């Protein structure tokens, strides 16, 4: 496919790039170590042969990523499904979701789209802050990721946002791909999910016509992701205390790596994805001459409401809400056994936090908030 050169530094690798990228990956010692860890019984030559047989990115995903994610879910989840009954699986969409897990939010979506009869997976927006290792950057671009550049000057950021938006419009219109992007930069560590207007502003920099036209051209779909348990909850709580105790605290070079590993392999309980109807009709209902900031405010609020309404809540969400509010207002939603099980889970997660000045009460409150906030937002949206 003839892809404009301006996208070369951010786009996923194309089929014609793959042979060279595979050769590069197979020469990398760290990549080989990862393969040996994931496939201890399989000879390296056999994996290399299977990799080189992949002619497209989708071939790679079906040969490697699909089975890997299903294997993870089999071991670390009690069930996983997607409600996408409001969508047409012959069309392509931009899924914009709440963000819980660095790797799995988009990886599970890819698997669920295939399982629900979509003809392809998603191109994935990923921040370059996660891609400091060149082989990781190669691998995610094979896996259909496009790159969001971070830590730029204001002028560079404007140029980068415009290129990113142009690329997203190109991927939807010319490549007929789906896209996944988080509703905000980074995960909502407290699970209080809110769409950042800056994401909508970026998306409307590309395309043609009015702001409403440009957003419509991306066929936006609000997507709710609900994990019964977040394996990274204790890491997120630890980070809250580190930031509270030291205003200058910054993540270390391995922190994201630990979060990725914990998120992938940790226990998730039940996992549910729910796609709201595409926003095209909603966008058509807006006054076309509305001030642009009003458009962004309205669309962001509407997306939030759709995401909140479509959460799958679990007993733990209601237990957390009642514990935080010192109430029994939601006890109809859980049993005494559910409550005891959830409280035991929280104690186990708190025990994993290693801090010299560990503030147990604060850390517990932070973890409870992560489970209570989806319930608060769901109840407010009904």
Indicate where each model-derived feature is located.
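Long, low-complexity C-terminal extensions of enzymes
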Residues: 295, 307-382
């Amino acid at each position: 496919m003839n892809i404009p050169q301006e996208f070369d530094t951010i786009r996923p690798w194309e089929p014609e790039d793959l042979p060279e990228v595979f050769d590069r990956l197979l020469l990398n010692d760290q990549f080989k170590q990862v393969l040996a860890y994931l496939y201890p019984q399989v000879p390296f030559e056999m994996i290399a042969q299977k990799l080189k047989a992949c002619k497209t990115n989708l071939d790679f995903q079906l040969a490697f990523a699909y089975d890997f994610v299903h294997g993870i879910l089999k071991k670390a989840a009690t069930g996983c499904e997607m409600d996408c009954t409001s969508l047409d699986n012959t069309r392509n969409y931009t899924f914009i979701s709440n963000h819980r897990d660095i790797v799995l939010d988009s990886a599970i979506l890819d698997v669920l789209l295939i399982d629900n009869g979509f003809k392809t997976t998603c191109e994935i927006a990923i921040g370059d802050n996660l891609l400091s290792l060149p082989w990781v950057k190669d691998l995610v671009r094979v896996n259909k990721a496009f790159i969001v550049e971070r830590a730029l000057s204001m002028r560079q950021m404007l140029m980068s946002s415009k290129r990113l938006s142009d690329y997203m419009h190109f991927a939807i219109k010319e490549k007929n791909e789906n896209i996944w992007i988080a509703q905000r930069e980074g995960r909502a560590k407290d699970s209080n999910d809110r769409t950042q207007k800056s994401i909508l502003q970026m998306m409307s920099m590309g395309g043609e016509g009015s702001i409403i036209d440009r957003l419509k051209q991306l066929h936006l779909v609000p997507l709710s992701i609900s994990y019964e348990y977040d394996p990274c909850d204790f890491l997120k709580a630890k980070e809250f205390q580190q930031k509270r105790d030291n205003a200058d605290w910054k993540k270390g070079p391995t922190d994201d790596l630990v979060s990725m590993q914990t998120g992938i392999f940790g226990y998730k309980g039940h996992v549910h994805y729910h796609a709201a109807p595409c926003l095209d009709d909603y966008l058509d209902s807006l006054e076309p001459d509305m001030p642009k900031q009003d458009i962004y405010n309205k669309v962001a609020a509407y997306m939030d409401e759709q995401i909140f309404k479509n959460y799958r809540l679990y007993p733990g969400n209601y237990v957390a809400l009642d514990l935080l509010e010192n109430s029994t207002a939601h006890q109809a939603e859980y049993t005494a056994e559910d409550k005891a099980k959830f409280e035991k889970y929280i104690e186990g997660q708190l025990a994993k936090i290693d801090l010299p000045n560990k503030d147990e009460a604060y850390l517990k409150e932070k973890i409870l908030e992560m489970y209570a906030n989806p319930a608060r937002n769901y109840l407010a949206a009904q």
